[in-house]
């Protein structure tokens, strides 16, 4: 799983190069030598806020942009961690959690992993498993991300969304040294209109199904003792 998650973030590399090119173009000297009037600072700030709001709305409405955005943010977290304090795992995991929280529906994923056991679990057990599941996945994710080596990732398909569509698979290809690995994010649209990641499949391995089977096996092995299954989940399942 670590190998799978470490490759997810590298899609940001190509985007970073494009951003650098755009920055270089923006820095070219203007031929207009006439002094320009200074803009009102409040208007500049207002304009920036409006632009940021529009970009945020676009990302929420477009699942493809959402996947790219979370990847770019993770790349920045990795760079910052490596350059400032590479031994502080607690701070790194906290930064990863901050990035993933708006994009990944951990509650939905935990619900699917528990399967039918969610119906017999108490509210406290469901809440505790969601927390344990999220924290364990983030730590595994974070350690995997630190091993990425700039593998090339391309968007394999970006078909137009149909009206009313609330589920889509964002497909990518991870180009390694000698092999191409297919990657697919399952994205679901919430009632708020926001697209969230609810599952990942890499090279034919469905993360959600794999973890659900592990939860089922652990519950059956331990006489359906959900408290034990939940408390030991981080060490056994991820």
Q: Where do the language-model regions lie?
A:
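Low-complexity, intrinsically disordered terminal/linker segments enriched in charged
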Residues: 191, 199-238
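Extended hydrophobic
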Residues: 175-204
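Solvent-exposed loop/turn segments at secondary-structure junctions
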Residues: 118, 135-136, 175-176, 203-207
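Surface-exposed, charged secondary-structure patches
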Residues: 139-181, 232, 236-238
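Short, hydrophobic secondary-structure boundary micro-motifs
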Residues: 86-87, 154, 228-229
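N-terminal propeptides/low-complexity segments immediately following signal peptides
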Residues: 13-46
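Sec-dependent N-terminal signal peptides
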Residues: 1-16
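Early exported N-terminus immediately downstream of N-terminal targeting peptides
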Residues: 28, 36, 46-141
């Amino acid at each position: 799983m670590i190998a799978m998650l470490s490759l997810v973030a590298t899609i940001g590399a190509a985007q970073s190069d494009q951003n650098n090119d755009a920055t270089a173009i923006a820095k070219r000297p203007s031929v207009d030598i006439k002094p320009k009037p200074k803009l009102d600072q409040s208007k500049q700030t207002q304009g920036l806020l409006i632009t940021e709001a529009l970009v945020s709305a676009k990302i929420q409405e477009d699942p493809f942009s959402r996947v790219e955005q979370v990847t770019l943010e993770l790349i920045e977290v990795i760079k910052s961690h490596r350059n400032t304090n590479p031994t502080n795992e607690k701070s790194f995991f906290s930064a990863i959690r901050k990035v993933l929280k708006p994009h990944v529906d951990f509650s939905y994923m935990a619900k699917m992993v528990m399967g039918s056991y969610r119906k017999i679990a108490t509210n406290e057990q469901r809440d505790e498993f969601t927390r344990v599941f999220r924290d364990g996945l983030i730590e595994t994710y974070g350690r995997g991300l630190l091993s990425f080596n700039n593998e090339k990732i391309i968007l394999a398909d970006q078909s137009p969304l149909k009206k009313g569509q609330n589920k889509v698979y964002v497909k990518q290809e991870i180009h390694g040294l000698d092999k191409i690995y297919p990657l697919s994010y399952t994205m679901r649209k919430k009632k708020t209109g926001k697209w969230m990641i609810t599952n990942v499949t890499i090279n034919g391995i469905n993360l959600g199904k794999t973890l659900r089977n592990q939860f089922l096996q652990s519950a059956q092995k331990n006489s359906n003792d959900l408290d034990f299954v939940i408390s030991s989940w981080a060490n056994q399942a991820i």
